[in-house]
Amino acid sequence: MSLVLSRMLLDRFFPGAGGVVAGEARPPMDWRETPVAHVFEMDLPGLAKDQVAVEVVDGHILRVRAGGEHEDANNAAKAGKASGEEEEENDGVRWHCRERAAGRRRAAVTQFRLPEDAAADEASARMADGVLTVTVPKRKGKKRHAGNGKAAGDDKPVCCRFWP
């Protein structure tokens, strides 16, 4: 079984096993390449623009963080509680399952390596109707600086959801 297929199965049946921090989820995403840009679209229903952060790390990794505090799952684990079985302080309600995206505090995180021709410093993002669109223009005839190049033996593109 290929590594990609293994990770797909792990992501579907054991969230967090495929390189994602416990308590975080990956949003569904589309990536299309046009003659002038790479365009990424992610479904983030129920989130406002100020609840989403888009950043480029090390000049070639696009990272999107959305939703609640990223420390919530770690804090619950330290307190000895499962994240889905926390008791609400204000009304004494105990949740046994919280899977709906709208209004939950779980964070959504995804990150992946941008292609060699991506001009990450010129990237733009917009949010409309629960869909985040990130547009990264292509460089004309130029590639990234040598210091940000591919690792030795790494000549295949990396898919958006399976990069560790």
Swiss-Prot record:
Write out the ranges of the annotated region (Disordered): 68-93
Domain sHSP, first and last residues per copy: 20-154
Q: Please indicate if the UniProt record lists Cytoplasm as a keyword.
A: yes
Coiled-coil residue spans: none
> Per the record, a Pfam family?
HSP20
What GO terms fall under cellular component here? Answer: cytoplasm
Where does this polypeptide localize?
A: Cytoplasm
Q: Name one GO biological process term.
A: response to salt stress
The protein's GO terms of the molecular function aspect are: unfolded protein binding
- This protein's source sits in the domain of life called Eukaryota
What the record says about the induction of its expression is:
By heat shock.
Keywords tagged on the record: Cytoplasm, Stress response
Give the principal location in a single coarse category: cytoplasm
Instruction: Name the family.
Output: Belongs to the small heat shock protein (HSP20) family.
Outline the subunit composition: May form oligomeric structures.
What protein name does the entry list? 17.8 kDa heat shock protein
